[in-house]
């Protein structure tokens, strides 16, 4: 009688001790294993059900490493199999005098994901991790279902990138996560490389591959090595090869990775959409986790295609024959314009504009997501500084620069006679640009050009 009475009780207890199918499938674990790209131990972590769609997350510079993903990991692990790790040189992984480059990191991630994920995955990268993720998607496109880039660092040419941080005081950026390490990117690219290049032309790609250089000059510091390798990596031909749906998320107050990089990537990637987090810094995904998650979730579900490229003409605006800015500061100009004349103006922003011809004199101007198309010379500059992002300039001569400095990113120059002429010496820094002229047949251009009188591009 006692046996029959106790049987239901034991059955209930036994049922409670047997894990549910969902629980049994969870693989929340942390471990170390040997890797053969850098020759050390790598810290790995998984969360969630491996039968679910997979998400791989790549962190940026700094010993915080993969701990930056804590909130996102917990939000995703119910519906996704999440795989994270500390990149070698950071966090709990081995630190040594190795070449911590985007290409080598991509090789490592491919090996790890092949072993522990085993199927195409959604790839998310922040800061340097965004640059690594871009390199990875280019190198191993079959592995990636969607790409998410968060405040990606180091994509622009190093001269444009270092110039962005140079004017900022330490006090203005120290309150941002990981900034001390992120600043080393610019310290190295600016101070070290400029100093060396002034002495003699050097091949920095060759030097950074040498163990004695990394040991003596970079003191075997992983952050210094990774930072220098990042700004040396040439991303100029990569964006056009990325066909995965790409979500680009940026804090609009980021003082570490210039927001213009986001506009450039949105312009150049075939299927990309840029979302800004208002008042967000370099780690807006930590500062605004709910808003970040609201953007990320639909992207991972692929419930929409990334935003299409804008129409060739801006939506706004009635056509204005002539617009002038004279001796003003902080002026914003947009819309469809015949002739735009800017003289003695500072901090002018031209955005989402279509212009027939533009003349800038004694001014500082930023131009974004705009086109200048002319039957003659499209853009003339005299004694001015011009920053162009995600643009198109076309004419008999695209740009005529006189004693001016131009920083041109993600922009195509088309000139039936010349892309650039300079009656007076002018300096142009190109990042992920294109030139189509009698001298250059629609080529990618990435680097600095000094154009002297009589010379042209």
Regions found by a protein language model. Give the residues of each.
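Alpha/beta-hydrolase fold catalytic core
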Residues: 2-56, 77-81, 119, 154, ...
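Flexible "cap/lid" loop of the alpha/beta hydrolase fold
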Residues: 138, 147-187
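Glycine-rich beta-solenoid repeat tracts in large extracellular/virion proteins
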Residues: 322-324, 338-343, 356-362, 375-382, ...
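Hydrophobic, aromatic-rich cap/lid helix
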Residues: 208-235
